[in-house]
């Protein structure tokens, strides 16, 4: 049986596949060893089937932040209560209000960016090879195995827990389920 251990290094992820404890020899690097530039995979774009659309150099922004300051947006209590009810997130603290206002300010900034003619990015890891598994044909009769993973079943179906139920707020400010 295989077990994958992932360690985060500076700007890369290295994976070590361990078959058993005996498979590790004294020459193997410990998992906690720092990742060096020699450990990183050599990724050459030329051999890729599809050339990358990710720019290799950062793009200089045309927007001067000093020239166009975004005004600080204040959110009133009625809007906060509506957002709390719709998103099921409690925004009672000052830090939550500040995070909400910062998010709105960030969205206002990126709204001004011209994206005409820019192809959508479908992954940030275009240069990484995906590990594909072999297709194994089976009889497909795995219903009992699949249903054994469910906590609660009813006849031949999974029973899902109830979803997020929005909270209604009465006139006194107390929140309760509908």
From Swiss-Prot:
The keyword Ligase applies. GO terms for molecular function: ATP binding; glutaminyl-tRNA synthase (glutamine-hydrolyzing) activity. Its EC number is 6.3.5.-. The keyword Nucleotide-binding applies. It comes from the Eukaryota. Residues 37-46 have a biased composition (Basic and acidic residues). Keywords: ATP-binding, Ligase, Mitochondrion, Nucleotide-binding, Protein biosynthesis, Transit peptide. It is an enzyme of class 6 (ligase). It is found in: Mitochondrion. InterPro entries: Asp/Glu-ADT_sf_sub_c, GatC. It catalyses: L-glutamyl-tRNA(Gln) + L-glutamine + ATP + H2O = L-glutaminyl-tRNA(Gln) + L-glutamate + ADP + phosphate + H(+). Pfam families: GatC. Residues 26-67 are annotated as: Disordered. Subunit of the heterotrimeric GatCAB amidotransferase (AdT) complex, composed of A, B and C subunits. Allows the formation of correctly charged Gln-tRNA(Gln) through the transamidation of misacylated Glu-tRNA(Gln) in the mitochondria. The reaction takes place in the presence of glutamine and ATP through an activated gamma-phospho-Glu-tRNA(Gln). Belongs to the GatC family. This is Glutamyl-tRNA(Gln) amidotransferase subunit C, mitochondrial. It comes from Aedes aegypti (Yellowfever mosquito).
């Amino acid at each position: 049986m295989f077990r994958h251990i992932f360690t985060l290094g500076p700007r890369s992820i290295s994976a070590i596949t361990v078959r058993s404890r005996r498979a590790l020899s004294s020459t193997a690097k410990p998992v906690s060893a720092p990742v060096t530039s020699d450990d990183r995979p050599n990724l050459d774009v030329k051999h890729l089937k599809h050339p990358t659309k990710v720019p290799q150099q950062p793009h200089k922004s045309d927007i001067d932040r000093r020239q166009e300051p975004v005004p600080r947006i204040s959110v009133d209590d009625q809007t906060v209560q509506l957002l709390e009810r719709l998103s099921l997130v409690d925004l009672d603290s000052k830090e939550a209000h500040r995070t909400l206002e910062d998010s709105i300010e960030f969205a206002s900034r990126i709204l001004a960016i011209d994206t005409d003619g820019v192809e959508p990015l479908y992954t940030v890891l275009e240069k990484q090879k995906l590990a594909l598994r072999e297709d194994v044909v089976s009889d497909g009769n795995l219903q009992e195995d699949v249903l054994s993973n469910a906590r609660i079943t009813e006849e031949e179906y999974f029973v899902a827990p109830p979803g997020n139920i929005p909270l209604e707020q009465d006139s006194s400010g107390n929140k309760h389920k509908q």
